[in-house]
């Protein structure tokens, strides 16, 4: 029973990792087969020069106005309310409810529920 459970977990991990590698490799462009024209190179260089000029202008303007250098941190209203609670676990759960997606919530709850079951199965052997 433990061997089959271990084998299943290894297979699931391999499938998930191969799926991620396949998704990353399919998004990459094969640059060896594409020809690069001179017009395209000139255009890229012009865009880079323009971007560098914009960065220089922006850096001089931020030196003049120091308020632009400060980070603006805003939090959702639900997160502020969740942080005000005295219960640490309750506050953590409310914060996770605001921040996490449904998929993340599912995996967190599944881990919390399945970990004691797996520990009992291993300990009973």
UniProtKB/Swiss-Prot annotation:
Motif mapping: RxLR-dEER: 43-73
Keyword Coiled coil: no
Broad class of the protein's primary localization: secreted
Induction: Expression is up-regulated during the early plant infection stages.
Any one GO cellular component localisation term in the record: membrane
UniProt key word Calcium: no
Protein topology in the membrane: Single-pass membrane protein
Domain description: Has the canonical translocation RxLR motif, but lacks the canonical EER motif, which characterizes most oomycete effectors identified so far.
Biological role stated in the UniProt entry: Secreted effector that does not suppress pattern-triggered immunity (PTI) in plant host.
Protein name in UniProt: Secreted RxLR effector protein RXLR-C13
Source organism of the structure: Plasmopara halstedii
The gene coding this protein: RXLR-C131
